[in-house]
Amino acid sequence: MASRRSAAAKKEDFSFEAAATQSAHEAQEGFPSSVIIKLVLVTVAMICAPLGTYFGTLNTICGGDSSYAGALAAISVNVVLIIYLIIAAREDTGESEEERKGKEGKEE
């Protein structure tokens, strides 16, 4: 059963939609392409590294023992994650010295 909405409720719905549209637009502008490229490369590495490690070591290094090959695959995923964390920690936040000085000036 449908219920009637008052005019005030319609205005609230409109402001919510406008805020959602504005925040979605800001989110699209917020990510540099270098960050997206790094994320895609790490995602591909997280898929390919364990599969390649597992099937590459299953019959060569591990002699057919899937437990050891699986353990090496898990280690390879952890190596990829550690590399990503190091890259993310070293990455600049994108805030320049002028922006920092501007923020400090506004706080005073």
Curated annotation (Swiss-Prot):
Residues assigned to the Lumenal compartment are 56-68
Kindly list the places in or outside the cell where this protein is found, as annotated in its UniProt entry.
Endoplasmic reticulum membrane; Endoplasmic reticulum-Golgi intermediate compartment membrane; Cytoplasmic vesicle, COPII-coated vesicle membrane
Per the record, membrane topology reads: Multi-pass membrane protein
Q: Which UniProt keywords apply?
A: Cytoplasmic vesicle, Endoplasmic reticulum, Membrane, Transmembrane, Transmembrane helix
Q: Which residues lie on this side of the membrane: Cytoplasmic?
A: 1-34, 90-108
Q: Does the keyword Transmembrane apply?
A: yes
Residue ranges crossing the lipid bilayer per the database entry: 35-55, 69-89
Q: Which InterPro entries match?
A: Vma21
Report the principal subcellular site: endoplasmic reticulum
Q: Name one GO biological process term.
A: vacuolar proton-transporting V-type ATPase complex assembly
Q: Which domain of life does the UniProt lineage start with?
A: Eukaryota
Q: Which Pfam families match?
A: VMA21
> Can you name a GO cellular component term?
ER to Golgi transport vesicle membrane
HAMAP family, per the entry: VMA21
Identify its protein family: Belongs to the VMA21 family.
What is the recorded function of this protein according to its Swiss-Prot or TrEMBL entry? Required for the assembly of the V0 complex of the vacuolar ATPase (V-ATPase) in the endoplasmic reticulum.
Protein's name according to its UniProt entry: Vacuolar ATPase assembly integral membrane protein VMA21
- Per the record, the gene is VMA21
